[in-house]
Swiss-Prot record:
It is a multi-pass membrane protein. Its main location: membrane. Catalyzes the excretion of spermidine. The lineage of its organism: Bacteria, Pseudomonadati, Pseudomonadota, Gammaproteobacteria, Enterobacterales. It comes from Shigella dysenteriae serotype 1 (strain Sd197). Belongs to the drug/metabolite transporter (DMT) superfamily. Small multidrug resistance (SMR) (TC 2.A.7.1) family. MdtI subfamily. It is found in: Cell inner membrane. NCBIfam families: PRK10650.1. The chain crosses the membrane at residues 6-26, 36-56, 64-84, 88-108. GO terms for biological process: glycine betaine transport. This is Spermidine export protein MdtI.
């Protein structure tokens, strides 16, 4: 793997933001009944994978994918809480803690 460069971290951050945007648009699409939000969600997913493909040029795939997925899930949970009033139950919180612990373990290995 190439030496770490901040540009790859920036690509990863962009991929995470685009994943969150895609998930929010998907919720707004109401099961694709509101087609414009469905199409925007698909475009954001494509853009997220494109950004992720640039990130893995300088970050190990396993690390980049774990961070992308983990931060994407955690931030999507926050967006669901802020925008839609969605709450996690106790099992959901335990799952989130395990997810974050897993991300840390992958990064440390």
């Amino acid at each position: 793997m190439a030496q770490f460069e901040w540009v790859h971290a920036a690509w990863l951050a962009l991929a995470i933001v685009l994943e969150i945007v895609a998930n929010v648009f998907l919720k707004f699409s109401d099961g694709f009944r509101r087609k414009i939000f469905g199409l925007l969600s698909q475009a954001a997913v494509l853009a997220a994978f494109s950004a992720l493909s640039q990130a893995v040029k300088g970050i190990d795939l396993s690390v980049a994918y774990a961070l992308w997925g983990g931060f994407g899930i955690a931030a999507t949970l926050a967006a669901g809480w802020i925008l839609f009033g969605q709450r996690l139950n106790r099992k959901g919180w335990i799952g989130l803690v395990l997810l974050l612990a897993g991300m840390i373990m992958v990064k440390l290995t």
